[in-house]
Every structure is written in C-alpha cells, then in structure tokens.
C-alpha cells in the first residue's frame, strides 16, 4: 500500500510542471490597414518553457477567401457575417494562396521565402514582422507560428489581417495627377494670360513658361496697341506722298503740273476711323490689318467726317506741318490771230489755232527775242520816242495810218511781245528774220498798245507774287513805289484808269485772304473763256 501512494505522488508532481510550461502565442492587433508603398510592423509575442535558441518563429501568408473591401457589400459576405462566420478567412488552404514570408531560429538572421527574397522584410524583437514598401499583393492574412521543442500543448499560432488599400492609392495617384495638371494649368495661365484668365501667382514659372514665345510676344504687342489705340484715333490720317517729294517732283518735271493740279483740286480722303474696339483682346492686330486692307482712298468722305473736317485738305497742306499753304493759278492769254467774231463762233477751231500758233512760237522764240533787243537798242541810240513829250497819249506821227486803218478791232489780252505779229498760222510759210526799220517798229508797237491795256512791267514785285513776299518787303516800300511811279509817269504817257493785267494770280490762303479771294475769283471766271493756258504753282 505504501508503494502505491508513492507512485501516485510522483505522477502528480510530474504533471504540474508540464501544465504550467505550455506554449502561448499573442498578437497586439488582429487587423491592420495600410496604404500602398507604406511600411508596416506586425506585432507577435510568445511564452514557452523551452530554450530561446531552440524556438523557431515562422510567418506565413494566406490570401483572403473573400476581399473584405470589394466583397463586403455582397450577399454572401453579409450572410456569412450574419451566421457569425468570417468570410474573408473561413475557407480551406486549397482555395487560396499560401506562402512563407520569413523564418528565424533563435537569435539568428531570418530567412526570407522564395517570393520575398528581393523584398525589404525582416523579423525584429522576439517575433515582430516588419515589411517595408507594402505592395498590392501583400493584401491577406498573416499567421505567426511558434515551434518550441518540449511544448506540445497550447495555441502555437495567431493570425493578423493586413488590408492593403491599393485602390485608395490608385485614387490618390489619380487625384495627384489631376492636381499636377491643375498646377500646370495655373502656371500656364499665369505666364500666358492671352489664353485664359487666372489670377493665382505660380512659383513654377516666374520668368519663363511652357507657352510659345511667339504667342507671349504677340500678347505684349497687343497690350501696347491697346494702350496707344485711343491716341492714334484722336486725329485722322491722310493718304498721299510727302510734301518734299511732291514739290521736288513738280519743280523738276513740268509735265506733272496738270496731274498735280487735278490732285490738288480733289479733297484728300482721311483714314476711316475704327467704329469700335474689337470685343476680343487678342484680335486687335487682326482687326487693324483688316481695316487697312479694306481701306479705299477713292471712296467719298462720310457726312459726319466731312462736317468735322471743314474745308478739304490739299495734297500739300494735309501732310505738311505748315498751317498755311499757298496755291497760285496763272492764266495766260490765248495766242489767236483771228478776229473776235471767229473766236466766238467756233471753239474747236480756236483750240486748233492756239495749238499751231503756240508750237510755232516756241520754235521761233529765241530769234525773235534777239531781233527785238537789237531793235530797242537801235531805237534808243537814235533818240526816237513813240510818245509826245509832256502828254500821256501817243505821238500822232507814230500813230500813223495803222491806227486809223484798224479802228474797229477789239482789244484783247496782252500776250507775249512778238506772239501776235510774228507767229504765222499753219497756212503761212515761215520767213527769215530781218531787222525792222525804226518806223515799222514804232507802228507795230503802237498797234500792240492799241490792242492791250497792259502797262509796262513795274520795277517792284510782280503781280503774281505771294502774300508772304509782300509782307517780307520793308514798310517804306509803298512810298518808294509811289515815288517811282510818279517819276515814270512824268516820262511815260498816262494809261487809262481800267487796265486789267493779262496775268492773274489766285492766292488761296486759308484764313486771311477769304475776302480778297472772292473778287479775284469772279474776275478770273469772267476772263477764263479768253485764256488759252493755265499753270498751277
């Protein structure tokens, strides 16, 4: 009986240490949420009676049976949850993927699994698993298993669910791309405001940006055009050549006198002002170019612009800086040898006769001037005078028969000295020049005096001089001129009261010659039917 009691006590003593030293594994979190490319640490700890160098720690990976994120709202998942089951982990290993992540014995270095050798994974402390740069396929259930020799009882493993939010990472990537595009757009708008209107300062392009340099330069130019636009539209611009070129070409080439007179008689067209600024800021340059292309200088001036402009500007006054521009029109008398009746009867015959006589006079102008100067010199040497002394009428000896033989001939405007007597018509044959006799010269001069009322040429300024030339003369010039005329009147005959000059000058000066211009124009219109040639200066 004593031996039986001893055996029972020995059995009880051996059982108690074995129950107290059984294996126990614990984990801190059963679920962990992590984003893609993040780092995570899965905590695991254990207690055992075995030696630490003999303990083997193993981390296994098992994929989810059903995804706890995408399959959470499915009917099967919700039904399993209602029954108290875990649909994400309640399946056999044959239905999911199983991998060994890492394994370590005692305090030695961990050994990674075949699928994780290129990964940054390690085991720290007693049994903590550290994963750097979590990938999307790390999404699953991790089991921490402890193997200790001699410990056959207890719970040797615990599970931890690692939920990788890879879909959230994808969303973050998409949002980041959108933010990047928005940032690029803000920078684009800040540097290239001709495409959009953004008022957010962007530090990515303080001086340069990705927009084209041509578009940026064009935008700056359009800003300058908009700033200078109102100043350019204040006064109209006129078309035509400059003043210096017109004057020089007119002086060098007399054939341009007729064209210049026609151009000066027509009012110049100002540039058509823009009705309104274009609504789009970047179309100002195109609008200006379109207006310049569509501009027609030949079209008439609008009524409103005509009322504003007042009198039309000529070719010279519209472009030059001078405010007063003078234009003189000189009308020359006709070169006609027919009586007045034939002159008024057939105008076409008069024009042909003028052309023939003027052409012949131009050819024989120089010989006639030379013979006339010789005749006057000879007449002065002989002391012969065609006027009677002390009287203002012609000497009867010089009047002769010629004055009585042509008493009915009407007076006509004075022309060139020898154009009426020595220029033959087309039907007459030319004769060689000869020196006239003194009596013949006196009779011819008396006949010319009877035809014309023009006095001798004065010594002062000519009748067609401008107002500026008259103003430039000294103030006592009038008294000197009257004294000079009294001296000449004592030596020359008294001319009639009405002695219209043959050369008329029309001074067109805006502002100060308006009253004088009316009388001169009326007298000019009455004599314009008798003039044969007009010259515009």
From Swiss-Prot:
SUPFAM superfamilies: Immunoglobulin. It is found in: Cell membrane; Cell junction, Tight junction; Nucleus; Cytoplasm. GO terms for cellular component: bicellular tight junction; cytoplasm; nucleus; plasma membrane; protein-containing complex; tight junction; tricellular tight junction. Residues 23-161 form the Ig-like V-type domain. Pfam families: LSR. GO terms for molecular function: high-density lipoprotein particle receptor activity; identical protein binding. It comes from the Eukaryota. Disruption phenotype: Mutant mice have early-onset severe deafness associated with a rapid degeneration of cochlear hair cells but have a normal endocochlear potential. Mutants show no increase in plasma CCK levels after orogastric gavage with fatty acids. Its main location: membrane. Residues 23-166 are extracellular. InterPro entries: Ig-like_dom, Ig-like_dom_sf, Ig-like_domain-LISCH7, Ig-like_fold, Ig_sub, LISCH7. Residues 480-490 have a biased composition (Basic residues). The chain crosses the membrane at residues 167-187. It is a single-pass type I membrane protein. Homooligomer. Interacts with MARVELD2 and OCLN; the interaction is required to recruit MARVELD2 to tricellular contacts. Interacts (via C-terminus) with TRA2A, TRA2B and SRSF1. Interacts with PLSCR1. Maintains epithelial barrier function by recruiting MARVELD2/tricellulin to tricellular tight junctions (tTJs). Crucial for normal hearing by maintaining the structural and functional integrity of tTJs, which are critical for the survival of auditory neurosensory HCs. Mediates fatty acids and lipoproteins-stimulated CCK/cholecystokinin secretion in the small intestine. In the inner ear, may regulate alternative pre-mRNA splicing via binding to TRA2A, TRA2B and SRSF1. This is Immunoglobulin-like domain-containing receptor 1. The lineage of its organism: Eukaryota, Metazoa, Chordata, Craniata, Vertebrata.
């Amino acid at each position: 009986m004593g031996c039986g009691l001893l055996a029972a006590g020995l059995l009880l003593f051996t059982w108690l240490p074995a129950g107290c030293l059984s294996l126990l594994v614990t984990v801190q979190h059963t679920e962990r949420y992590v984003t893609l490319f993040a780092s995570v640490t899965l905590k695991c700890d254990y207690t055992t009676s075995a030696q630490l160098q003999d303990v083997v720690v193993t981390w296994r990976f098992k994929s989810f049976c059903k995804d706890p994120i995408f399959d959470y709202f499915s009917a099967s998942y919700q039904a399993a949850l209602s029954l108290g089951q875990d649909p994400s982990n309640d399946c056999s290993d044959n239905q999911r993927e199983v991998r060994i992540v890492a394994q370590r014995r005692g305090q030695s270095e961990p050994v990674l699994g075949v699928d994780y050798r290129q990964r940054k994974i390690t085991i720290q402390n007693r049994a903590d698993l550290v994963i750097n740069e979590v990938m999307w396929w790390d999404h699953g259930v991790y089991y921490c298993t402890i193997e200790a020799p001699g410990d056959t009882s207890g719970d040797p493993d615990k599970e931890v669910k690692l939920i990788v939010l890879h879909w959230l990472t994808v969303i973050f990537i998409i949002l980041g791309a959108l933010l990047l595009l928005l940032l690029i757009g803000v920078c684009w708008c800040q540097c290239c405001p001709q495409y959009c209107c953004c008022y957010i300062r962007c530090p990515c392009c303080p001086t340069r940006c990705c927009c084209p340099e041509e578009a940026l330069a064009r935008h700056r130019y359009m800003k300058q055009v908009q700033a200078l636009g109102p100043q350019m539209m204040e006064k109209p611009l006129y078309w035509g050549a400059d003043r210096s070129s017109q004057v020089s070409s007119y002086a060098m080439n007399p054939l341009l006198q007729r064209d210049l007179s026609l151009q000066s008689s027509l009012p110049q067209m100002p540039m058509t002002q823009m009705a309104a600024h274009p609504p789009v800021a970047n179309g100002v340059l195109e609008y200006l170019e379109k207006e310049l292309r569509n501009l027609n200088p030949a079209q008439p001036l609008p009524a409103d612009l005509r009322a504003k402009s007042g009198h039309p500007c000529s070719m010279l006054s519209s472009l030059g800086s001078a405010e007063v521009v003078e234009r003189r029109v000189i009308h020359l008398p006709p070169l006609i040898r027919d009586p007045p009746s034939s002159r008024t009867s057939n105008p076409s015959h008069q024009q042909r006769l003028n052309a023939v006589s003027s052409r012949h006079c131009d050819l024989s102008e120089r010989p006639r001037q030379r013979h006339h100067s010789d005749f006057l010199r000879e007449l002065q040497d002989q002391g012969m005078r065609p006027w009677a002394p002390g009287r203002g009428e012609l000497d009867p000896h010089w009047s002769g028969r010629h004055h009585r033989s042509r008493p009915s001939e009407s007076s006509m405007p004075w022309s060139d000295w020898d154009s009426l007597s020595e220029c033959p018509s087309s039907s007459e044959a030319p004769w060689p020049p000869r020196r006239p006799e003194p009596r013949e010269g006196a009779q011819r001069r008396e006949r010319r005096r009877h035809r014309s009322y023009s006095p001798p040429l004065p010594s002062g300024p000519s009748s067609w001089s401008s107002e500026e030339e008259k103003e430039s003369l000294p103030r006592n010039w009038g008294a000197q001129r009257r004294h000079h005329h009294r001296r000449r009147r004592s030596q020359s005959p008294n001319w009639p009261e009405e002695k219209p000059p043959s050369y008329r000058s029309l001074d067109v000066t805006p502002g100060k010659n308006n009253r004088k211009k009316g009388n001169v124009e009326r007298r000019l219109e009455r004599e314009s039917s008798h003039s044969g040639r007009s010259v515009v200066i």
